[in-house]
A protein has these predicted regions:
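Short hydrophobic/Thr-rich beta-strand motif most characteristic of the beta2 strand and flanking loop
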Residues: 55-62, 68-71
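Charged docking surfaces used in two-component/phosphorelay signaling
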Residues: 45-53, 65
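Alpha4 helix (beta4-alpha4-beta5 surface) of REC/receiver domains from two-component response regulators
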Residues: 100, 107, 112, 122-141, ...
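C-terminal catalytic ATP-binding subdomain
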Residues: 1-25, 54
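Acidic catalytic/metal-coordinating carboxylates
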Residues: 63-66, 82-85, 97-101
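Receiver (REC) domain active-site loop signature in two-component systems and cognate sites
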Residues: 93
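Active-site T/S-Asp motif of two-component receiver
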Residues: 89-90
Length: 158
């Protein structure tokens, strides 16, 4: 939080990405809702502002357990794919981390095909290997608005 105040991050997403996502939304009937899981209020709000700027509604939760409980509850109400486009999750969180959240999503019959993007300040070969092992669709670094926008575009166009 302090770092965000003394050295603000550019949260501006390129107009090209916004336009490309708007075009996809015109061509396809996509669900304009994304679940965000991050224990950092600052990071959660950054992602939320970015996806709301793309015309999506955000469901924001503070950890993986809360995310999984919300997704499971939604799946009981009907097809999750009619309610949400994708999940963007931090990796390091209390209660349930992003790796475990992804693995639990893949094990749940009503959630298993949900698109999951792991969004983290961590980097390295180990993380990429873990991302692949738990079955996440994508791994992106915090906080690059264009990279986030491109990942959302790939998820909704696929």
């Amino acid at each position: 939080k302090i770092l965000a105040e003394i050295s603000p991050i550019d949260e501006t997403m390129s107009e090209d990405i916004k336009e490309e996502i708007a075009n996809i939304q015109e061509e396809k009937d996509i669900v304009r809702r994304i679940l965000i899981a991050d224990d950092s209020t600052v990071a959660r709000k950054q992602v939320q502002r970015a996806i709301e700027g793309l015309g999506f509604e955000a469901i924001a939760v503070k950890d993986g357990k809360e995310a999984y409980d919300k997704l499971a509850e939604m799946a009981e109400e009907g097809s999750i794919y009619d309610q949400i486009s994708l999940v963007i999750s931090d990796i390091e969180m209390p209660e349930m981390d992003g790796y475990t959240l992804t693995a639990e999503i893949r094990r749940h019959s009503g959630l298993k095909d949900l698109h999951v993007i792991l969004h983290t300040s961590l980097s390295g070969v180990f993380n990429q290997a873990m991302v692949e092992r738990v079955g996440a669709n994508e791994f992106i670094a915090k906080f690059n608005p264009d990279e986030l926008g491109s990942a959302v575009k790939a998820a909704v166009s696929g």
